[in-house]
Amino acid sequence: AGEGLSSPFWSLAAPQRF
């Protein structure tokens, strides 16, 4: 959740994880 702010790409990489 918080990491999404630092790594916006993570949201596209694993949206199911968050």
Swiss-Prot record:
Compartments reported by the entry: Secreted
Entry keywords, A to Z: Amidation, Neuropeptide, Secreted
Residues where Phenylalanine amide is found: 18
Cellular compartments per GO CC: extracellular region
Keyword Iron in annotation: no
Gene Ontology BP, a term: neuropeptide signaling pathway
Main localization of the protein described in the UniProt heading: secreted
Source organism, top-level taxon: Eukaryota
Its biological purpose: Modulates the action of morphine.
Protein name: Morphine-modulating neuropeptide A
